[in-house]
Every structure is written in structure tokens, then in C-alpha cells.
UniProtKB/Swiss-Prot annotation:
Its main location: membrane. GO terms for cellular component: ciliary pocket; plasma membrane; side of membrane. The lineage of its organism: Eukaryota, Discoba, Euglenozoa, Kinetoplastea, Metakinetoplastina. Heterodimer composed of ESAG6 and ESAG7. This is Transferrin receptor subunit ESAG6. Transferrin receptor subunit involved in receptor-mediated acquisition of iron from the environment by binding host TF/transferrin. The gene is ESAG6.
Length: 399
């Protein structure tokens, strides 16, 4: 942003043209560009929201795993399911998968951070462009964004760009409701990008003004922003490659569709035909696709594992709330561990008959005064940790 303020300062007294045939950017195109900028900022909210859904699915998997273990301890695994015959192997696989899924979840979060960062950078480039053009306005014949009249566009003509009087403080921020709402739209990235293409906008919505608008920011001739223009060095681009100018463009802005590399002729003006080829959008497309791929992969794996678990869970265990499940599981585990200890001690004295009886125990355990509903946050956290430790112990030989 500092660069553009310096540019404006340097061009301040000569930023407007002194000859005719100087057109401005149409406010319609400016608003479309700002709409894209808002959508790109919203990608941060979008990836955070989608990541939270995956985290919730992983938590659900852990609960299904506990339900299954409780069903096993109470001999309530559906006997008719062929896939439930080798429960021990299934549980080990689930625990191993949980660890793998947690790693994949972290990789997905890293991908989401990169996608959000790339989108934020692209959004910044776009809004800096429109901000500079909106600020470059003086008398009725000197402005760089036009609304089809003899005067510059005001903030009410650029409501997709500014939330009030034109200025850096009124650009939409990432925490604004407008940006958050954009994250909820069903529009996909490629659809929003295509909305600013030359084919979507057309010349009439890009080239504004009446030919006497005096905008020097669309000139690359010797009197424009690139003084002493050279046909090999002094091409100009705005928006990171959205609007491109060849050397010696006098401001007439006879725009055609094309990319930065196509603006090679004298006086050429090319507005992107394919935004996916614009450099600032390439990283957004690539990194957002990587995030989506990582998200979809881990969601699919979690769903497959949950489906395998669900068909082996007893009906009563499936009906428990999460709080009830933790309480039941903890007390059942404590009871089983105590029982295993007693059996081990008795076995040392040859009490084989009692050992058999104990190992076939299926009664509900006697519970103490503990209830999750009445516990404080620290106790709940401790119970979750205890449950995780007990699950490992069960798989090591208690079951």
C-alpha cells in the first residue's frame, strides 16, 4: 500500500492529463474487481469454516470408537455382522487411523493457511489498484474512474469497494460482515474469477468516460506515468495483470481481450480474457485446490472408518449422548481394570474357577458419585484424557 501512496505523491500535481482523448475506467468494472477482492478475503473464513467441519467429523469418529469399545465390554456387538467378528483388529486399525487422520488434519490446516494468505495478497493488489484510481480525481475533466458523466465516481458509485467516503480506512476489512457473508456464497472460485473477464464485462463496462477524462494512470506514452516510454521496457499492468498496457498508450483505452504478454503493440490495451492466467490468481487457484483436495481426502477416509465402526456398535451404546458415553466408558473401564487386577492376583493362587466367572462378567458396574453433567471443565478434560489412556490399556490385553 505504501508504494501506491508514494506513487500518488509523486504524480500528485501532474496526475491528470492536459489533452483530450484520455478515458477512465468504468465504475462497473471497478465494482466487479472489488467484488472479487471481497470474495478473495472471504476465503480465509471459508477455509476456517470447512476445517472446523473436518475437526468435528474427527471428533465424531473418536466417539464412535468409544461406543464400539463400550459395546465390546458389555458383549453387545451385533452377532450377525460378519465384519464385526475380529473386533480387536478393527479397534487397533481405528486407533491407528485416528493418529493418521490427525496428521492429515494438520496438513489440511497448513494448506488452508497458505490458500488464505494467497487470496489475501491477491485481494490487496486489486483493492490498491481501485483505490489509486478512485483517489486520482480532481476537477470534472480529471478523474480515473467514470460513471458515464462529466465527473469522477464518488463512494456511492463504488459501494462494492468502499464503506463510506473513499479512503484507505473505508476499504472492506476481513472481519467485516460483508466479507464474512461472501464466504457463505455458493459461488465457486472459478465463477467469481470469470466475472471480471473481458468476455463477461465487455468494452462498454471497462472503458468509461467521454474521452476527456484526463486520467494519466492509463497512459504509457512520454507524458504518462512512465515518462520516456520504451517499446521493450515500459509496459504497464494494473491489478497484477488484469488490465495491461503496451508502450505509448495515450489514454484512449481502446481495450481488447488479452493477457499481459499480449500487450506488445504500441498503444495496446488488454483486459484479461482468462483470469486463471493472471499471476496473482494462479497461487490462489493452486493452493485453494490443494486445500480442497486434502479436505476431501481426509473426510472420505473418516467417513469410511465411521461406517465400519457404526455397524458394530450396540444399540444402547449408540443412543448415549457424548456426556453419558464418557461417563459409562470411564466407569466400565475402571471396573474392568480392577477386575483384571483381582483375577490376576487370584490366578496366582490357582483360583481358576473364579477366574472364569470373573472374565465372563457382563453386569453393569457399580458407579460412584461422578457425573459428567455436574463436573467442572477441568474434570471433564481429565475424564477425556483418562478415557484415552484406558482405551490403549484395553487394546493391550484387558479385552
Amino acid at each position: 500500500m505504501r508504494f501506491w501512496f508514494v506513487l500518488l505523491a509523486l504524480l500528485g500535481k501532474e496526475i491528470y492529463a492536459y489533452e483530450n482523448e484520455r478515458n477512465a475506467l468504468n465504475a462497473t468494472a471497478a465494482n466487479k474487481v472489488c467484488g472479487l477482492s471481497t470474495y478473495l478475503k472471504g476465503i480465509a473464513h471459508r477455509v476456517n469454516s470447512e476445517s472446523a467441519v473436518v475437526t468435528e467429523k474427527l471428533s465424531d469418529l473418536k466417539m464412535r470408537s468409544i461406543q464400539l469399545q463400550l459395546s465390546v465390554m458389555r458383549n453387545r456387538v451385533p452377532s450377525g455382522e460378519q465384519d464385526c467378528k475380529d473386533i480387536r483388529t478393527l479397534l487397533k486399525t481405528v486407533l491407528r487411523n485416528e493418529f493418521t487422520f490427525q496428521q492429515e488434519l494438520e496438513e489440511m490446516r497448513n494448506a488452508s493457511a497458505l490458500a488464505a494468505a494467497a487470496a489475501g495478497l491477491a485481494a490487496g493488489r486489486l483493492e490498491e489498484w481501485i483505490f489509486v484510481f478512485a483517489q486520482a480525481a480532481g476537477r470534472s475533466s480529471q478523474f480515473c474512474i467514470s460513471v458515464g458523466k462529466t465527473g469522477p465516481a464518488e463512494y456511492n458509485n463504488l459501494q462494492e469497494c468502499f464503506d463510506g467516503t473513499i479512503g484507505p480506512e473505508t476499504l472492506y476489512k476481513i472481519e467485516d460482515s460483508r466479507v464474512k457473508e461472501s464466504a457463505k456464497t455458493s459461488l465457486q472460485l472459478h465463477e467469481v474469477l470469470s466475472s471480471i473477464s473481458f468476455g463477461s464485462l465487455g468494452v462498454k463496462n471497462i472503458r468509461g468516460g467521454n474521452g476527456k477524462d484526463g486520467c494519466n494512470l492509463v497512459r504509457t506514452d512520454t507524458d504518462g506515468v512512465l515518462e520516456g516510454g520504451s517499446p521493450t521496457r515500459h509496459n504497464l499492468t494494473w491489478g497484477g495483470g488484469v488490465m495491461n498496457f503496451g508502450s505509448y498508450q495515450n489514454g484512449s483505452m481502446y481495450v481488447e481481450g488479452g493477457e499481459y504478454g499480449d500487450a506488445t503493440e504500441y498503444g495496446a490495451v488488454r483486459w484479461t480474457e482468462d483470469p486463471s492466467k493472471v499471476s496473482i490468481f494462479k497461487d490462489v487457484i493452486r493452493l485453494f485446490a490443494r486445500f480442497q483436495e486434502a479436505k476431501n481426502a481426509v473426510v472420505k477416509k473418516i467417513k469410511t472408518t465411521v461406517d465400519e465402526l457404526t455397524k458394530c456398535i450396540g444399540q444402547k451404546e449408540a443412543e448415549l449422548t457424548n456426556d453419558q458415553l464418557y461417563e459409562e466408558f470411564i466407569w466400565e473401564t475402571i471396573n474392568r481394570l480392577e477386575l483384571s487386577k483381582r483375577v490376576s492376583e487370584q490366578s496366582a493362587f490357582g483360583e481358576e474357577e473364579e477366574t472364569i466367572v470373573k472374565f465372563n462378567y457382563t453386569a453393569e458396574p457399580v458407579r460412584g458419585p461422578f457425573t459428567v453433567a455436574g463436573a467442572n471443565a477441568a474434570a471433564i478434560h481429565l475424564s477425556v484424557s483418562t478415557a484415552a489412556l484406558c482405551r490403549s490399556a484395553l487394546l493391550l490385553g484387558v479385552l
